Amino acid sequence: MFVQRLSAAPWTMIAAIDAGALRERAFRETAGRLVILLALIAGAFVFIEYYSRYPSIIEFRFAPPFNRLRFYAVFLTVLLLTVHRAGEALDTPVADLFSAFGRLLSGLLDFPYSPVRLVLLALPEGTPPAMMAEVRDAASIAYLVALGLLLCFAWLVKIKGWPGRQGAFNVWLNLPLFDPTGGGDVLARLKRDSSINIVLGFLLPFLTPAAFKLVVLVIGPVSITSPQTLIWVMTAWAIVPANLGMRGIALHR
């Protein structure tokens, strides 16, 4: 049990570090050092949270592999985007394969009114075509990982009967922020929260580019041309809604 709890922290740190680790310049810059510091803090928090006997913030601690899937999705997204973005610098067959994979996905997922197309429409006018291609490929890769995450979890719930095989589901341990004494029927509140999370998980990939466009109109141009900025923005844009969708499915279950 101790080893299982200990193993959660390194994945958090690795997912946050690898975007800079594959690019040596990041370690010589302030942003790179800040990412490492935040990764260490996040890893320490996850370790303390999982090792403690009583829950505080993290949900579904004792309903694996819910959180494990989320960590793996973030790690995989950051890794794929990093290798794809650094393809020319790495100049390896693996990097070339990821670059070709990104171009293939962009052709499949970039269609009218798709989230990927809306991301492109949110870019400032005059964005170079090469940069637009990079953003399109990154958005396609991140969105595919998010869809895969949702499908994988839905399969676990529908086919494997999650979380039934993990024993009795303790609401207090797995939903520490949910107050069953808050008033009203508990099942009705869980279904309401489930519906809200699923709707937000579906809509956010469409609404976020529009919100970004409004922010640009208010505060001026915002550049995402930096490799690390592009990687983390695309990761958050895709994985955060997927996490909300997962939470909605879990609450409905």
Task: Enumerate the predicted regions with their spans.
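Alpha-helical transmembrane segments and their helix-start/interface "positive-inside/aromatic belt" motifs
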Residues: 1, 60-77, 139-148, 188-198
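Loop-to-transmembrane boundary segments
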Residues: 1-9, 182-205
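Long, highly hydrophobic alpha-helical transmembrane signal-anchor segments
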Residues: 55, 64, 68-69, 86-150, ...
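Juxtamembrane inter-helical linkers in multi-pass membrane proteins
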Residues: 162-185
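Juxtamembrane "helix exit" motif at the C-terminal ends of alpha-helical transmembrane segments
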Residues: 23-25, 204-225
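N-terminal ordered "arm"
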Residues: 1-59
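Alpha-helical transmembrane segments and their immediate juxtamembrane interface regions
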Residues: 216-253
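Alpha-helical transmembrane segments
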Residues: 30-39, 137-158, 230-239
